[in-house]
Amino acid sequence: MRLASRFGRYNSIRRERPLTDDELMQFVPSVFSGDKHESRSERYTYIPTINIINKLRDEGFQPFFACQSRVRDLGRREYSKHMLRLRREGNINGKEVPEIILLNSHDGSSSYQMIPGIFRFVCTNGLVCGNNFGEIRVPHKGDIVGQVIEGAYEVLGVFDKVTDNMEAMKEIHLNSDEQHLFGRAALMVRYEDENKTPVTPEQIITPRRREDKQNDLWTTWQRVQENMIKGGLSGRSASAKNTRTRAITGIDGDIRINKALWVIAEQFRKWKS
């Protein structure tokens, strides 16, 4: 379920309008990298990510969020991994907005990858759909631009299915025991060993805002996702010391958790249908 890329802490920018090239240059300079990293072979086809973005812009997709991983080796800064979330023009605002997640690097650590996602405005959470909705990978060879554009439309083609599943989850009620089970499953994704989880399932399913107090499957998932990604929950460590859960600040970890939570939610949807 993990992506073929590893992101640590990162620089990021988010706007509720299309990002400009100046903003991208300031926060994700690797998007404009002028050449491949010296470690790449002659077979590696190099195309700056900004060229891909401009082609996607021509097709009606605009970036609203961008981030780039921080690297210790400054020589790799211009080639480091980056992620952009793009929305279809005309579908910018709304409670939940479908997005295309584009990942890439020019140091050989990642191919182009595109994944369907959803942005939830009420809590500014970026959700990532599970593997069953498709994940497009384009290696750095051949007609990269054409394959990425084709992949973008493939991802766009599953948005209706994503929306249908989301609406179905909103209609499924979970009782307190079922919500507890969802929280327990989510904690196992993060900590693996139930004896090492610093917080309880009850904490992870607790809402942070009034509008998230509903007991449907979709809202339960949103509560769990936000609590896990943002952290800050009081708990006890394995050595019985007071602690707080850490926010997930790495992009790779964010996407891994998100995709796993989508799979759990899908399993609950099928179980309750």
Regions found by a protein language model. Give the residues of each.
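Generic detector of bulky aromatic hydrophobic side chains
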Residues: 44, 68, 222-226
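General structural signal for secondary-structure boundaries
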Residues: 16-25, 31-32, 47-51, 55, ...
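Amphipathic, interaction-prone secondary-structure segments
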Residues: 46-112, 262
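Intrinsically disordered, low-complexity regions enriched in serine/threonine
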Residues: 1-9, 90-97, 102-273
